[in-house]
Amino acid sequence: MIQELDLAPGERARFISDIHFGHAKALAREPEELGFLLEGCSHLVVCGDLSETRESPCREEGLEKRARFLRMCRDAGVQPVLLAGNHDPDEKAGLLKLQGGRICALHGHALFREVAPWGWEYLKNKQVSRELIAAFPEAEADLLRRLELARTMSVLVPPVYTCSGTHQNKLMRFLAHSAWP
């Protein structure tokens, strides 16, 4: 789905992505650490991966922090605009057209048919991924089909990582996270 946003004179939008609330490697551990992003803007565009919404050990913590962050936005009078990423494919919009389409924003996962060809999800599920790609031949030339492929791939290929404190072996944890995100 495409979302449109036209800013009125004096309104400002700030763009961020890949916050990954709940994930062990997230740089911002708590939503309050990002309060400064809400200063001086009327809209905050999150270009995917605010938190993990797929079934995973990180989901519950990520959703709780996501809700707190969105509450912070509302309290600051900032309108959040959430776009789908590979970790939150259930967000409604995959593409934002700003100012009548002169500016477009999306999460980078749609740039690759494999979503993240360097990631564990693809490496552990190559056959399923290849079958999905074959089912979307129009995705080569049609952006909306590419976004649909990316969303489908993100939903059907399960996440492969752990949250902080859930993995005993530090070497294995390091190796599992070496291909972040």
Language model region names:
Residues M1-P181:
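Extended recognition/assembly regions associated with phosphoester-bond processing machinery
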